[in-house]
Amino acid sequence: MAAPSSHADAVAQDLRDVVRLLVDRPQDVAVEVVDEGDGFFLEVTAARSDAGKVIGREGRTIQALRSLLTARARVDGERYDLDLLD
C-alpha cells in the first residue's frame, strides 16, 4: 500500500482538528488515512460516548464533514471518503 499523499495527510489533520472541536474527549480523536488507489479513505475514531456528537442529529454533522471533504477533494484533485469507527 502506498504512503498517503501530502494532500491526504493535510486533510486528515484538518479533519482531526474539526472533530476535536465537536467532542468532549478530544484527546481520543484520531484520523487514519488509507490509500485506496483511486482515492483516500479517512477513518475517524473517537470515544464511544462522542460518536453521537460526530454523527449529529439525523446524521447532519457527519454529512457536513463529508461535504467539506468533497469540496477539498475538488481543490486537491483527489477523492476522499469518510467513516466513523467505533
What are the language-model segments listed below?
Residues 55-59:
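Glycine-centered tight-turn and secondary-structure capping sites
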